[in-house]
UniProtKB/Swiss-Prot annotation:
This is tRNA dimethylallyltransferase. It comes from Rickettsia rickettsii (strain Sheila Smith). Its cofactor is Mg(2+). Substrate binds at residues 67-72. The lineage of its organism: Bacteria, Pseudomonadati, Pseudomonadota, Alphaproteobacteria, Rickettsiales. It comes from the Bacteria. Its EC number is 2.5.1.75.
Length: 363
């Protein structure tokens, strides 16, 4: 096993098993392409992946990609190989009530590697990207102080963008004000709250859809707390989180046909392995205001099934369609927004898994 610390270069790869050479420009660009004669995945030992031994920077990996692309498996294997610990960067996997519908890492993984910021928060608690970033920063420091490698895994673009490019440090909202605004929202609903926001902060109202409950409440809270538009904070210098780290971003980009297949299979598995009971329990224990705005794909469809508006097959089919649409949007976002990344392309999960295992045998 290879430990990773300030003085250790990371090299992912290792084994080339096709007859076709990987093109030199792919190596230069830090990309991994499939050879013409096979669909195997290659992880390349790119010297750019980490700085050389003279670097004083600590290393960090961000492993991103669409849902159902194999991030959890690859991240777990990397953590085992490079003495790492894993930090969640998925906005829905923070909630402890929905580990099944969000496909959180299995318990077996957590017995081998330390996992952080998964399933720790009640969905009734207020949470924001700023709160996430503060927690993630603390975990990154704790992990590097132990001489280990932080590996951040997820597909939430807002969180990843804020980690990589910095964030606008909006003042904390008091708990009393949060409670007041949420009670107001329950009483008057989205449209009237949006109307109030328009009076106080027309700029925010012009940019926020009336149906976007989370952003609407957030903008109203910020104005009530600060007297300023939430968008005014975007003109200030951004707080940087990873500027002291040698950060490498690995983007998993399966072929679309295969990605859609894995999306469908994941939803089918989730529905069969407890997601229905998970959402039924939430429906029983919590008020609708606590769960109707959760964005995890499948919750809306299962609620429709539980309310008698869809059959189980219809709910599953609707969830699969929405998952494929979400995965497509994620791929587009990562391609366009994150430029400096290592892209891994593959067309078959079995070959991806086997090649990965073969690669780590040679380290």
């Amino acid at each position: 096993m290879l430990a990773c610390n300030d003085d250790t270069s990371l090299y992912l790869l290792v084994k080339q098993v096709t007859k076709k050479e990987i093109y030199s420009n792919d190596l230069e660009n830090g990309n991994v392409k499939r050879g013409a004669s096979t669909h195997s995945l290659y992880l390349i030992g790119d010297p750019k992946f980490c700085r050389n031994n003279s670097s004083k920077q600590k290393s960090i990996i961000i492993l991103c990609g669409p849902t159902a692309s194999g991030k959890s498996y690859l991240g777990h294997e990397l953590a085992k190989a490079y003495n790492g610990e894993i930090i969640n960067i998925d906005s829905m996997q923070v909630y402890k009530e929905i580990p099944i519908i969000t496909a959180s890492p299995p318990k077996s993984y957590k017995t081998e590697i330390l996992y952080h910021l998964y399933n720790f928060l009640s969905m009734t608690e207020d949470f924001s990207v700023i709160k996430y970033l503060k927690l993630a920063t603390e975990k990154i420091k704790e992990i590097t102080d132990r001489g280990k490698l932080p590996i951040l895994i997820g597909g939430t673009g807002l969180y990843i963008n804020s980690l990589v490019f910095g964030y606008n440090n909006i003042p904390d909202i008091s708990e009393d004000l949060q409670a007041q605004v949420r009670n107001l929202h329950v009483k008057i609903g989205n449209i009237e709250l949006w109307g109030k926001l328009e009076k106080f902060d027309p700029l925010a109202a012009s940019k926020i859809n009336q149906n976007d409950t989370q952003r609407l409440i957030r903008a109203y809270e910020v104005f009530m707390q600060t007297g300023k538009s939430i968008f005014s904070f975007q003109t200030l210098p951004k707080e940087q989180i990873l500027s002291d780290f040698n950060c490498k971003i690995i983007f998993l980009n399966p072929e679309r046909k295969f990605l859609y297949k894995t999306c469908d299979e994941r939803l089918d598995k989730i529905f069969k392995e407890g997601a229905i009971d998970e959402i039924a329990l939430i429906k029983k224990q919590f008020a609708p205001k606590d769960y109707t705005n959760l964005k995890a794909v499948g919750i809306k469809e299962i609620l429709a099934y539980l309310n008698g508006n869809l059959t189980l097959d219809e709910a599953l089919n609707a969830a699969q369609i929405r998952t494929r649409q979400y995965a497509k949007r994620q791929v587009t976002w990562f391609k366009n927004q994150i430029q400096d990344k290592i892209t891994l392309e593959y067309a078959n999960q079995e070959e991806f898994t086997q090649t990965l295992k073969n690669s780590f045998k040679t380290i």
